[in-house]
């Protein structure tokens, strides 16, 4: 049975950032940003009784990145890649860095929202100026408990 999942989180600060084809999980500097996003997701899932993660069908993701005039600039696709990496489990071949940054519910080996970003079929990402840095991730997909 497929269970629909819809979730939206808004996170203060800058999103995790991927550099070229290197996984966000390979950069220890990104660990606190990854953990912040993962914690927000886990909190929203718990508050709304959402179990599981998107692992079936087609997934839609909307991302809004709010930057200030003094924000450190990065290509929008680097942030999208960083967010995608962060909502999946860390690949098995990535090192265990900064394990103490993560809580048991946000541990890198846990899939918090997306089993594989190849399920994403529709992506909308925008960057806009704001008074404070933050970003919003909205995801719609399905969880198949039998997988």
Predicted segments with their positions:
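Acidic, proline/glycine-enriched N-terminal capping motif
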Residues: 1-147
């Amino acid at each position: 049975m497929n269970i629909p999942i819809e979730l939206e989180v808004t996170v203060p600060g800058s999103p995790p950032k991927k550099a070229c084809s290197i996984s966000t999980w390979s950069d220890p500097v990104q660990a606190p940003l990854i953990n912040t996003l993962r914690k927000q997701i886990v909190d929203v899932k718990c508050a709304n009784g959402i179990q599981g993660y998107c692992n079936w069908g087609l997934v839609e993701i909307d991302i809004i990145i709010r930057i200030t005039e003094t924000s450190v600039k990065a290509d929008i696709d680097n942030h999208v890649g960083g967010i995608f990496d962060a909502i999946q489990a860390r690949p098995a071949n990535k090192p265990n860095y900064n394990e103490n940054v993560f809580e048991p519910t946000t541990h890198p080996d846990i899939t918090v929202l997306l089993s594989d970003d190849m399920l994403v079929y529709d992506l909308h990402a925008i960057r806009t100026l704001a008074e404070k840095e933050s970003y919003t991730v909205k995801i719609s997909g399905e969880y198949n408990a039998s997988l």
